[in-house]
Amino acid sequence: MILRYNIIMITDQLLAKYPIISDQVDAKELGVLLRELEKVLRSGAAGNIVEFGCYVGTTSLFIRRLLDAYNFAGEFHVYDSFAGLPEKTQADNSAAGEQFKAGELLAPRKTFIQNFKKTGLKLPTIHKGWFADFTPEDVPESIIFAFFDGDFYESIADSFRACDSKFQKRATIIVDDYANEALPGAARAVDEWLRRHPARLTVESSLAIIRR
């Protein structure tokens, strides 16, 4: 019980102290993400962390704060086109998601960097490009925690493809929008990956939590 209390306390302190700088994630979803990361950090696992889809840096800032709170010695890498959403495919079609179009949610790389500089936090390693263009050589070894926020089917599938050979045996993977009817491609990509890889899936808020 003490361990569980400590995990919640650190995450909640961060959420209470610092602002959420965009409307693309809410406090509940962010809390789920941070608590899962904190469990990994508390376990003492050594390795690296990746985030595919960082937008203006909202989640990246909180991830960095939590890593700093634990004196995390591994690498933190973020990946984004910084050019907005890519084109949809058939797998993403949903009447509830008509507002999600190519080019939406555009945030320049310099905006991400400026948001980090305002806080004085250490920048992660930034990779600019479409997820389809990244290869396993672009991601670090020994991934212990991954957050995929690609919105569309191919973006999530490409994130898995790039990281597949780099996940540690007991990695935790969080995928945004798994339970979001407006973005059905995210769930399709996750379900396809799970059919080929033994892992445990739970869903909280709109997030898929995958534990290998």
What are the roles of these predicted feature ranges?
Residues 1-174, 178-212:
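A short alpha-helical cap/connector motif
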